[in-house]
Amino acid sequence: MRQRALASVLCFTFMLVCGGAWAQRPDTSGPQREAMQKLDFWVGEWEGSGWSMRGPGQRAEFTVHESVQSKLGGVVLLVQGLGKGKDATTGAETVGHDALAVVSFDPKAAAYRFHHYTMQGTSGDADLVLTDKGMQWELVGEGQAFRMRFHIEIQGDTWHEYGEFSRDGQTWTRTMEMTLQRVK
């Protein structure tokens, strides 16, 4: 019984000491919040439609819902997209795009980071660059010579995005395009 009481006292003391040390950590989020405010125009619920290439000459139409939320007191954005289209053989509605991204600002590098994850199990990191009308980011294939580049332009409540593919970083082919409207 004494050992349990001693263990409980030690555990409680450890929690008090560690909790106090955690609470004393300085808040360094100011520069991050300030930089992330530049992306406030993106926050909202968005719906629309578009097309993507599924192979040579195989253009597929889709509808999409994108949710962009400010999280952790404005330190990050959570971006979640769900795109649905029709199966070419059966005509049944299928999910073709289900992705999640976390956008943050790295004050040491003075750069925005785009960390993404897809339903296919892929993930990656990219620098997100602000442009005059929106933003862009580029993904480089691991172990393969290819690049994907995405551009988003937002004017008022309209989000226009297109993606491009390149094997050499010089010649680009448009592989997807979508236009969304802010619904919330």
Regions found by a protein language model. Name each.
Residues 1-3:
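N-terminal secretory signal peptides that target proteins for export/translocation
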Residues 8-18:
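Bacterial N-terminal signal peptides
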Residues 22-184:
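Hydrophobic small-molecule pocket/channel-lining residues, especially in calycin-type beta-barrels
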